[in-house]
Amino acid sequence: MKKIFIMSIITMLSSLLSCQAQNKSYKSLSADDYEKAITDTTVIRLDVRTAEEFADGHIRGAINIDVLKSDFEQKATATLPTSKTIAVNCRSGKRSKNAAAILTKNGYKVIELDSGFNGWQAAGKEIVK
């Protein structure tokens, strides 16, 4: 009985560890590190906020695909080449983490702005309207 219990615990722990490793297959970066990363001209800047939020201001060179839309995955995979690194941002960092998970599941290399567009603005980084 003890062996079964111990084996169950080991199985559960290894499952949790493998899930955690899969969930973090993208890099979350500070505003300063994100800014450095997107200076690479091969990196595609993706803003996953709504069209209205994007129109109010965004990071220079970003394209907009709303992660809240049901066709996000389809649009993103049809638009973005898997050969490029995708730099994702949203307003606060929550939606970009969801988008990053979807993109990495589809074979993309992804970096994500941890503090979102709000953190980008608070750090005094350039925005365009």
Regions found by a protein language model. Name each.
Residues 2-5, 19-37, 43, 52-85, ...:
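Rhodanese-like catalytic fold shared by cysteine-dependent sulfurtransferases
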Residues 7-16:
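Bacterial N-terminal signal peptides
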Residues 45-47:
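Structural scaffold elements adjacent to functional motifs in cytosolic proteins
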Residues 89:
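Short, surface-exposed ligand- or partner-binding patches at beta-edge/loop junctions that are enriched
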